[in-house]
Amino acid sequence: MKIHLIRHAHAGSRSAWDKADHKRPLSPRGEGQAKAVAAALADAGIDELWSSPSLRCRQTLVPLAEATGLEVQVVDVLDEGNDGPPALDALLAAAAEGRVVAACSHGDVIPAVVATATRRGAELEGPRAISKAGRYVCTVADGQITHILAVPPPDGDT
C-alpha cells in the first residue's frame, strides 16, 4: 500500500501577496509543476486526493484530479501549521482501509509527517524536507509507514 505526500507547487512570494495567504494561487511555474506531478502519478493507482484547505494545495491536485477522474477532498489536518501525528494517523487509517491516497500539503506539515513516521520506525531515503512540487512515496505495511522515498520536484528545483 502507498501514500503519496506532495508539497504544493510554486505559488509565488508570500510577502508579495496582499490577501489572505490561504487564497494565494499557484504561479505559472507552479501550474506547470502541477501538470508534471499529475503526469508522474496518473497511473499510480490512487483512490483518493486529499488537500489542505489552501488554494495552492487544491490547485496542485487539479491536473491529477482531471487525469484520474477523482475529486479533491479538503482535509483540515493537512492545513498549514498542523502537527504531524494527526495527519499521519488520518493517512494510515485510509491505508488500513485499502485506499491509496495522494495528499497535498505544506512545507511545515509534510516534514512533520515524515518526522513522525521516522520516529515510528520508517526508513527515509532522501532529504527530510523537499522543495515545492516535490513528493514522498510512502510504503505502508502492518499499519505503519515502513519506507519513505523522496522524489524531487519535476523541474529539478532544490
Residue spans for each PLM region:
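Active-site-proximal alpha-helix that buttresses catalytic centers in soluble enzyme cores
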Residues: 2-82, 122-123, 130-133
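Domain-level recognition of soluble alpha/beta enzyme cores
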Residues: 118-149, 153
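Generic beta-sheet signal
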Residues: 3, 97-108
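Short hydrophobic/charged patches on amphipathic alpha-helices used for structural packing
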Residues: 38, 89-92
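Short, solvent-exposed coil/turn elements at secondary-structure transition points
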Residues: 9, 78-80, 141, 151-154
